[in-house]
Amino acid sequence: VRRFESWLASAGLGVTVKEFPQGTRTAVDAARAVGCDVGQIVKSLVFVAGGGPVVALVSGANRLDERKLAAVAGEPVTKADPEAARAATGYAIGGVPPFGHATEVPVYMDRDLLGHRVVWAAAGRPDSVFEIGPERLRELSNATVVDIKA
């Protein structure tokens, strides 16, 4: 299933997905496959805040501070289980893209991602990623840029 690529094509975004059979499930794996700094990898982390999903886009070099995410979300947060993550985004954990989700999901973006010329994010599967400028990522994901790193 290449649903995210179909979504990208229909949206006419001109973004190219790259596949890596060795996998891009973790930030380190993705950075190694792409040949970039781990800080340029976008981790799309799905949480539940007050019964609704939220997505945190975090630099691969950073750990998320769940208290900071809860503060910006305005509700306590818990990590989404695999079923909740798929229901909210349409994708399995390890391949969740930063936008193009199945439902309207609030997105919060780690400020550190803006410090890179380009970043790489999951493209719907645990073996594929795409390159994008961080400002364009913010715009397309409708993300609120915040300090959410630990």
Residue positions per predicted region:
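Extended, low-hydrophobicity, polar/charged segments
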Residues: V1-A150
